[in-house]
Amino acid sequence: MAFLKKSLFLVLFLGLVSLSICEEEKRENEDEEEQEDDEQSEMKRGMWSTIRNVGKSAAKAANLPAKAALGAISEAVGEQ
C-alpha cells in the first residue's frame, strides 16, 4: 500500500511540474505575440504620420487647406 501511495504522489508531482512548465511556455508565447502586435501598431502609427506629413506638404504646395488634403488622404487610405 505504501508503494502505491509513493507511486501516486510521484505521478501527481511530475504531472504538476509538467503542467506548470507548459503554462509558463504558454505565457511566454503570449508575451511574444503581444510584443509583435505592439511593434506592428507602432509601425502603422509611424506610416500614418509620414502620410500625414506628405499630405500637409502637398497641401501647402497646392495652396489647399491642410485639413482638406488630410481628409482626401484619410478617405483614400480608408478605401484600401
Swiss-Prot record:
Xref: Pfam families: FSAP_sig_propep
Compartments it resides in: Secreted
Chain ranges passing through the membrane: none
InterPro entries, per database record: Frog_antimicrobial_propeptide
GO cellular component, one term: extracellular region
Keywords, sorted A to Z: Amidation, Amphibian defense peptide, Antibiotic, Antimicrobial, Cleavage on pair of basic residues, Secreted, Signal
Positions of region (Disordered): 24-45
Sites bearing Valine amide, chain numbering: 77
Proregion positions: 23-43, 79-80
Lineage: superkingdom: Eukaryota
Protein's job: Possesses a potent antimicrobial activity against Gram-positive and Gram-negative bacteria. Probably acts by disturbing membrane functions with its amphipathic structure.
Similarity field: Belongs to the frog skin active peptide (FSAP) family. Dermaseptin subfamily.
Name of the protein: Dermaseptin-A5
Organism: Agalychnis annae
